[in-house]
UniProtKB/Swiss-Prot annotation:
Comp. bias regions, Basic and acidic residues: 250-261
Swiss-Prot/TrEMBL keywords: Ribonucleoprotein, Ribosomal protein
Protein name per Swiss-Prot or TrEMBL: Small ribosomal subunit protein uS2
Ranges of Low complexity composition bias in the record: 275-308
Family annotation (Pfam families): Ribosomal_S2 (PF00318)
GO annotation (BP), single: translation
CDD domains: RPS2 (cd01425)
Protein family (similarity comment): Belongs to the universal ribosomal protein uS2 family.
InterPro entries, A to Z: Ribosomal_uS2, Ribosomal_uS2_bac/mit/plastid, Ribosomal_uS2_CS, Ribosomal_uS2_flav_dom_sf
A Gene Ontology molecular function term of the record: structural constituent of ribosome
């Protein structure tokens, strides 16, 4: 089954590029034609690139990796947060802080600070041992950290790959990822530079429906990778490494486990009659051997004839 269909891409407006005066000549090979001053992206190429990106993301997650979702423009914020949360991956949908990847050790300290602030009960002034003014200052600090770092609060290390919506707007994130040799998977509009992206998806990065569709496809790849990772861990008898599964993934795997347990007793019952039938002929075998034991009695007359 195809990851996404041509019809879905068309209905979501993935084929619409930028105006002809706002383009990057390096994107020429991905452009199908031009209509009313707007470039039309070749969706046949987009489909093949989507499949390639899907397989890469799935394999990365299956081997214990994480994928960071990045999209701070208004059209992408909701889709990025929703899809990343669905599959339990880190995301940035507000402002990209410089050094989020290249200076992660410092960012990690701020994440620890956020967790400390989350332990404070701002409603109970007496129990906190702080004045109202001090609590107000801390609550503002917490709100600021939640806004900028809330999406990556569970991240322990730099991601294995990043999914980016609009590489021109997120050029700092792209630069940091390339500096650390982290693979970049991104939507490429007609004004982007394809050389900056490892796994490119030619498409519209401005329309909400287009961004939502492509982000959902990447999230589906992550979900499939999580299931594969969990299956491999069960086969080895070890818990799979990396980020924990999302709740819906755990429910799915537990359902499969219960179904397997229900089938096991039925298979055991079916084997018992077969074993009994196989043992019955074996029990009768000694009776068939009885005539052989009587053979010496038949030879007795021959011995009497010799004596006569």
């Amino acid at each position: 089954m195809a990851v996404v269909t041509m019809r879905e891409l068309l209905e979501s407006g993935v084929h619409f590029g930028h105006q002809t005066r706002r383009w990057n000549p390096k994107m020429k090979r991905f452009i199908f034609t031009e209509r009313n001053g707007i470039y039309i992206i070749d969706l046949l190429q987009s489909l093949s690139y989507i499949d390639r990106a899907y397989e890469f993301v799935k394999e990365t997650v299956a081997h214990g990796g994480t994928v960071m979702f990045v999209g701070t423009k208004k059209q992408a914020q909701e889709a990025i947060a929703e899809q990343a949360t669905r599959v339990g991956m880190p995301y940035v949908n507000q402002r990209w802080l410089g050094g989020m990847l290249t200076n992660f050790s410092t960012v990690y300290k701020r994440l620890q600070r956020l967790k400390e602030l989350e332990q404070i009960d701002f409603e109970d002034v007496a129990a906190s041992g702080l004045t109202k003014k001090e609590l107000l200052v801390l609550s503002r600090e917490k709100a600021k950290l939640e806004k900028t770092l809330g999406g990556i609060r569970e991240m322990q290390k730099v991601p294995s790959a990043v999914w980016i919506v609009d590489t021109k707007k997120e050029h700092i994130a792209v630069g940091e990822a390339r500096k650390l040799n982290i693979p970049v998977v991104a939507i490429l509009d007609t004004n982007c530079d394809p050389d900056e992206v490892d796994y490119k998806i030619p498409g519209n990065d401005d329309a909400i429906r287009s961004v939502t569709l492509l982000t959902r496809v990447i999230a589906d790849a992550v979900a499939e990778g999580l299931i594969a990772r969990s299956g491999a861990g069960k086969a080895e008898g070890d818990k799979a490494a990396g980020e924990p599964l999302a709740a819906w993934e755990r429910d799915l795997l537990e359902g499969e486990k219960k179904a397997d347990e229900a089938e096991a007793p039925a298979a055991a019952e079916a084997e018992k009659p077969a074993e009994a039938a196989a043992e019955a002929p074996a029990a009768e075998a000694p009776a068939a051997e009885a005539p052989a034991a009587e053979a010496p009695a038949a030879e007795a007359p021959a011995a009497d004839a010799e004596q006569a």
